[in-house]
C-alpha cells in the first residue's frame, strides 16, 4: 500500500508571522519553560556528553541525558541527590538499556526500597515500536505507584504518528505510562538507518501529525513530544517547536561546540590532523586554530563499542570529523535570541503560546535553494 500524501522535512517549510503582533520587542518574550530552561535536550551520544562534561550543559539551561557509554555505577549516582523526591532533579535523565531498565525498575525486589525517591529514566533503544518495551514500562509504572516513588519515563524512537496515539492512550490512574517520547528515526547526522533500511517519516510532518493527534485526544496529561534528529541549525529547532514539539533533542550541533566530550583534533604544521587533550584544545581554540571533533552515531561500530565494548551488530551509524565552530554559551545565547525573535513575530509572549500554535507554509523549490545558501 502506498500512502498518497506528501511528507515534509524542516527545510520544506517556513513559519508565517501573525497578522498583527502585540509584542513590541523580543525582550518581552520568555523562551524558557516552567523549569527556567530552554526546551532542548542534549542527545545521549558519547561523543557529545558524558559524566565529566554534563554540568556545563546543565549550567547553560539545557536538559541532559547521560549516555549508556558511561559506567553503570556512575550513571546511577547521577540520578541526583540520592534520588530523593524532595530534592529531585527535573532536568537530567539517565539512559538505560532495555535490560538495565528491566532489572532496575521491573523487579519488585529491586524497587521496594525506593519510597519517596525520584528517577528520570531514558529507555534508550532504537526501535520504539516494540510491544515488549511498553509492557515493561507499564510494569515499571505500576510498581512506582505501589511503592510510592516518582518514575518519569522517556523512550522511543518512533516514526509513525499512530504509534504516538497508542502511546498517549497508555495510562495508569489517568497518568501517562510514557512521559516523553522521542519521535524521529533515521534523521540524525550520525545515523544511516534510513539509507539502509528505508525506515523514516519526514520530521516536520511527523511532529505536526503527532501534535494534531494530541489536540484530537484532548487528554489532561499527554505524552510530551521530543523531536529527535535532523536539526542542523537554530531555524530547525524553532520550526520543530512551532509544529508542536515540546522539546528538541540535539546531537551533531552540540558536537561542534568546544565543550563536547568527543576527541579533539587539530591540523599540525605538516597539514596532518593530530589528536590533542581537552586542555590543549581550549588553548588552540583561543589562538584561532581550527579544531575538529570526532563524532559518531551511537548505532555506529564506534558507538556500539562505546556501549558494549565490542561491535555487536551491523552498524547503522557513521563516524566523521566535525569542525568546532563555537563555545556552548554563545550557541545558547544565539538560540535564545533567535527563538525570542521568532516568538515576537508570531505574537507569543510565552513559550506555551508558541509551541504547536503556528502556521507554516510549504516553500517552492527555488525558495528552498535560496534558504540553503
List the predicted regions and their residue ranges.
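Alpha/beta catalytic cores of nucleotide-metabolism and tRNA/nucleoside-modifying enzymes
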Residues: 1-21, 174-176, 198-227, 231-373
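Active-site entrance/lid segments in N-terminal catalytic domains of soluble metabolic enzymes
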Residues: 1-224, 252-254
Amino acid at each position: 500500500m502506498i500512502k498518497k500524501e506528501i511528507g515534509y522535512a524542516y527545510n520544506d517549510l517556513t513559519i508565517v508571522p501573525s497578522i498583527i503582533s502585540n509584542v513590541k520587542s523580543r525582550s518581552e518574550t520568555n523562551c524558557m519553560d516552567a523549569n527556567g530552561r530552554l526546551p532542548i535536550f542534549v542527545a545521549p551520544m558519547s561523543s557529545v556528553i558524558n559524566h565529566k562534561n554534563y554540568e556545563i550543559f546543565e549550567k547553560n539551561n539545557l536538559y541532559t541525558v547521560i549516555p549508556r557509554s558511561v559506567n553503570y555505577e556512575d550513571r546511577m549516582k547521577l540520578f541526583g541527590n540520592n534520588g530523593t523526591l524532595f530534592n529531585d532533579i527535573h532536568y537530567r535523565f539517565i539512559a538505560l538499556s532495555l535490560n538495565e531498565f528491566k532489572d532496575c525498575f521491573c523487579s519488585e525486589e529491586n524497587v521496594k526500597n525506593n519510597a519517596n525517591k525520584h528517577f528520570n529514566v531514558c529507555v534508550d533503544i532504537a526501535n520504539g515500536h516494540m510491544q515488549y518495551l511498553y509492557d515493561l514500562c507499564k510494569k515499571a509504572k505500576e510498581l512506582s505507584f505501589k511503592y510510592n516513588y516518582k518514575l518519569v519515563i522517556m523512550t522511543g524512537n518512533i516514526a509513525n504518528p499512530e504509534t504516538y496515539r497508542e502511546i498517549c492512550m497508555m495510562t495508569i490512574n489517568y497518568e501517562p505510562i510514557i512521559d516523553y517520547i522521542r519521535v524521529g528515526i533515521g534523521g540524525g547526522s550520525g545515523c544511516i538507518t534510513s539509507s539502509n533500511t528505508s525506515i523514516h517519516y519526514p520530521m516536520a510532518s511527523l511532529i505536526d501529525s503527532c501534535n494534531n493527534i494530541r489536540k484530537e485526544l484532548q487528554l489532561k496529561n499527554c505524552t510530551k513530544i521530543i523531536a529527535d534528529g535532523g536539526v542542523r541549525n537554530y531555524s530547525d529547532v524553532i520550526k520543530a517547536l512551532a509544529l508542536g514539539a515540546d522539546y528538541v533533542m540535539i546531537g551533531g550541533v552540540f558536537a561542534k561546540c568546544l565543550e563536547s566530550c568527543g576527541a579533539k583534533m587539530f591540523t599540525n604544521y605538516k597539514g596532518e590532523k593530530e589528536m590533542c587533550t581537552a586542555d590543549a584544545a581550549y588553548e588552540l581554540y583561543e589562538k584561532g586554530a581550527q579544531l575538529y571533533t570526532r563524532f559518531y552515531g551511537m548505532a555506529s561500530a564506534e558507538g556500539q563499542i562505546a556501549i558494549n565494548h565490542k561491535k555487536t551488530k551491523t552498524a547503522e551509524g557513521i563516524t566523521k570529523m566535525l569542525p568546532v565552530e563555537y563555545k556552548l554559551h554563545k550557541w545558547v545565547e544565539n538560540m535564545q535570541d533567535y527563538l525570542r525573535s521568532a516568538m515576537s513575530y508570531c505574537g507569543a509572549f510565552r513559550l506555551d503560546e508558541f509551541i504547536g500554535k503556528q502556521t507554516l507554509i510549504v516553500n517552492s523549490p527555488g525558495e528552498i535553494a535560496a534558504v540553503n545558501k
